[in-house]
């Protein structure tokens, strides 16, 4: 049983790592995130890690929510993640996801 869970986890990580995407990113506030490096994505598994790249900067954040539900946007970042990426003043930016 333990081995099959481990193999499933590896396969899930590998599948999510292969899902490169380009599109728009925005950020959202709220007390629910407690200053964490988190994000919302429509399809990636909860708890998976996403690498977000913007203008030479890159961050890793954990998927803990669903969204964004605005056409053209591929990810919503927590305030801390947006600040680390350097996109706070722009609000919405074009990013690459890995």
Language model: regions and residue ranges:
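Secreted/periplasmic proteins
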Residues: 2-98
